[in-house]
Amino acid sequence: MVTEAKPGSSAWFSHVEAAEVVSDPAAAAWDVDVDVVVVGYGGAGVAAALHAAEQGLSVAALDRFNNGGSTAMNGGIVYAGGGTAVQREAGYADTPEEMFKYLKMEAQGVVSDATLRRFCDESPGLIDWLIGHGVKFKAKAFPGKTSYPPLDYFLYHADSSLAGGYTAVSKPAPRGHKVYSAIHNKTGVGFGRALWEPLRHAAERQGVKTFPPAEVRRLLVDPQGAVVGVAALTFEPGSAAEREHARYRRTSTKLLLALPPQFPGGKFLWKLAARYSAKAEALERAHRVERRFRARRGVVLSAGGFIFNRPMVEALAPKYSAGMPLGNPGDDGSGIRLGQTAGGAVDRMSHLSAWRFLNPPVALSRSMLVDARGARFCDESWYGSAIAYEMCERHEGKGWLILDAGLYRQAWRNVLRDKLLPFQRDPVVLALLFQRRKAATLEALAAKMGFDPVVFAQTARAYNDAAAGQAQDPFGKTAADMSPMGEGPYYAIDVSITSRLFPLTTLTLGGLKVEEETGAVLNTAGKPIKGLYAAGRTAIGVCSHLYVSGLSAADCLFSGRRAAADMAAAVN
C-alpha cells in the first residue's frame, strides 16, 4: 500500500505543516503586513521581489539560509538569445524564432508553444533588465563546443545547437551568457554571486525587506482557500543566536560542497557537515520565534527543488539516487510541499536532469559511448544533459566510453595542455587513471566488459563507417566530430551514474504546476489558487524536460518576473 504524501506522513519528507485557516485575515494579528511575500530568495525570488517592488508593491523576502540559493552558487550562466545586446556586440545574428525552434526540440511540450515563444521574445529584454540592475556581461564568444567556457570567454554555445541533428532544424547561435566579475574571473568559481548580488542590492534600493534566516513552515489561508500569508520561524535580528547559526550553516554548506559524496573522503565531509547542521538546528529549536506575514497580493514560492532532500529523491526518483546532487541545502522540497498544502498539484517529480559532459576534453566526445550491451545510444557531441537523459532513462544509467590508443593519448594531451577548469579536468584525470579497463583487441574488451560480442562488433563497424563518411550516423553525429577505432590497446571508461570518480551531477526538474500566463499555482482540478504563485525550480518551467546551461537561471528570472507582473496587475 502506497502512503499518501501529506504533512506528518512517512512519505512527506518535510517539516512543512498543514495550511492554517485564518477566519478573518483583516482582523487577525500580523507581525508584518505587505503586498507580496517571497519564500526563497535565490534567482527566482530576487527577480520576483525586485520586479514587484519596481511596480510599487511592498515586498518581504524570506529565506532559511540567506545565501542566494543555487543561483548564487552556479556558474553564472543565463541562457538568452533572440538578438541580445551581448550577441549583437559579439557579431552574432540571432532571432526569437531560431531560439524558439531550438528550445522546442529540448522542451518537448513541457510548456505550451505560447509560453516558450514568450520566453524567447522576452529574452533580449531580460538581458537589458539585468544590465540595468548592475549585472555585467562581456561579448567575447567561444566558438566551439564545451561544457563551460574558458575564463576569458563570456558567450558560448551552452546547448546542443552545434550538433548535426539540431543544425538541420535551427540556426545555431551562442546563447550562454556568462556574467563578468573581475574577482570571480581570477578564481574561476562563484560567478553565480555576480548574477544574484547586483539584483539583491537593487531590490534593497527598491525597498524590499529581508529578514534573519526564516523558515516558512505553514501557509495561511482564508476560509475560501485563498492564500493570505505565511507563518515563519525566525531569529531575533542581531541576536547572538542568529550570528552563531549563520556560522554553523556556512561551515556545513562549505563541507557539503567541498567534495562529491562519491569521492574518497566525500562521505566523511558529509558526515562532518551533518554535525554542524545539527548544531544549527539545535539553535533553531532553542531560539527561533514564529512571525506571521500577511501577503495582500500574493505569496511567491521560489525555494528551489529537492535535490538535497536525499530521502525524497530516493523515494520519488530512485534511478537518479546514485547521482551527485547539484544545488544547496535549501533545495529540500519545502517550497513544493508548501504549495501542496494549499491544494497545489505537482508534476514530473520523478524527472531529474543529469549531466554527462564529454567535452572537454574533446577527445572523449570523438569516441563512442555504449551501454551494457555494447550498443551506442546517442551523439556523443550532444550537451551533457541530453546524453545523460538517454543513459539514465533508457539504458539503466550505464555507459562506457570506448577509446583506441590514439584517442586515449589525445585525451591525456587535452587534460594536460588545454585550459580546463578543475571541475572539467580532475574527474576526467581520475577516470582515465582508475575507472578504465584495457584490452589488446575490441573482442577482448567486449569479453572483459560483458558486452554482447555481436552487438559490440556491429557497433564498432557502424561507427567506423560513419566516421569515414561511408554511412550516415543513426544519431546524426557528423564525421567531423568522430574518430574511427584505430589500433589498440582499447579502453572502456566508466561514465555510468554509479561512477565514483567521474560523478554524474543531478538536479530536480519537477515541481508545482502553474498557470503559464501568470505563474499562479494550479490545484488538482487545474484551477489557479488565489494568492499563490510559484517560480524557479519550485515550479514546472521551460527547463523541466531537459536542461541546458543557464536555462534554469533564465527560467528563474522569467518566472519570478512573471509572477510579480501578475500581482502588480491584480485589482485590490
Name each region found by the language model.
Residues M1-V36, E54, T251, S277-A278, ...:
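Extreme N-terminal leader/targeting segments of oxidoreductases
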Residues F13, V455-V542:
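A glycine-rich dinucleotide-binding beta-alpha-beta segment and adjacent secondary-structure elements
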Residues V34-A61:
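N-terminal Rossmann-like FAD-binding beta1-loop-alpha1 element of flavoenzymes
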Residues E54-G75:
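Glycine-rich FAD pyrophosphate-binding loop
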Residues Y79-F119:
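Glycine-rich active-site loop/strand segments that organize a redox cofactor
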Residues C120-V289, A467-A492:
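Conserved redox-cofactor binding core of oxidoreductases
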Residues G190, G238-F357, R562:
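Glycine-rich loop(s) and the adjacent beta-strand/alpha-helix scaffold that form part
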Residues I336, A345-F451:
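An anion/pyrophosphate-binding glycine-rich loop and adjacent beta-alpha core
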